[in-house]
Structures are given as C-alpha cells and as structure tokens.
Amino acid sequence: GRLMGKRFHAQNFIDHSAHETHCCNYLLATDLEMATPEGYAASSWSQGYGDYIMQPDLDTLRVVPWLEGTAMVLCDVLDHHTHKPVPHSPRAVLQRQIDRLAAAGIVAQTATELEFFLFEKSFEQIRKEGFQDLTPISGYNEDYHILQTTKEEHVMRPLRNHLFAAGVPVENSKGEAEAGQEELNIRYA
C-alpha cells in the first residue's frame, strides 16, 4: 500500500478535523497510477463517487522526522452514511484478522523484510522514459557486502534513521542478491 490522505494546518486539525474528515471513496478502488478501473461495487463512474469518513486514530499520531514541523496520523475509513467501518479498507481487513487471532488466544507479532531496488536515475526520469532500460545503482550481487553497499548509504542511512525516529522498530539494512537490490528489516513487534 501507500499513504494517502490530506495535509492539514495544525490548528485546523485540532479545531475541526481531529474527530473526522472526508475523502472520495475512489481511493480504495484505484490502481498505482490512480486510475479507476471498472468493476468495483463500492465506487465507479457509472454509479458515481461518494465520500468516506476518515476517522483519525490518535494512538497512531507521530512526528514525521524527515519533514520539519510535520506529524502524521492514520485513519480508520468509515461509511459516510452508516459511520461503520468500510469492510474492504486495509485497516479494517487487518483488524478483523487481529480479532480472529485474539479470539483463538493468539497475539499477532510480525516482522518484515522490505526489499526494493535502487536505480541510477530518479523516478521522474524513469517514468518519462517509459520505465525502460533501468540501470541499477550497483552492477552486481551485493548480498551482505558491507564495503560495496557504502555507496547506497546516502539513501539507506536516512531511511533507517527517519523510520526509527518515527517509531518504526528498524533492525538493519543490507544489500541483496540482485543488482541494485536493497533490504530493510523491521524488528518483531
């Protein structure tokens, strides 16, 4: 997934939006390019688009270290008319699974390896060139290679440090097996 939402002036958030704000319901029915494919029951061009309520979960409020003077809060997505959770929203799907585990006497603990590629050109350059002829930042396998991955530290060190400062339990990062591939590990929590 990706973070979607709005940027509020702090005072407006405190005065008017700390309990709810709104978004178009197409946000849960778009592809990565923000196109709205047909076939979704909850929203479509044929039936029109409505609103969802975004209800801030203030327990998730945290400073965003990489943007000065910025905080972030995650929201639950509610139906505009019933004020009930939208069942296909990512947080609602996750909460149902956590509730199922709890009912079975199990406490969920997760960790993840976030694997991705770094390229020589910027995303904007790559997009303009049609995502063709991508050149990885490294020309070979850098799996566990401390010396060679030093050249990626201008990206990886701030990533580790900013996420950790935002409360994400970062464990480590390392090179991976494919050219230009990186791995960021998040500790069990």
Where in this protein do the model-derived segments appear?
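ATP/Mg2+-dependent ligation/transfer catalytic cores
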Residues: 2-175
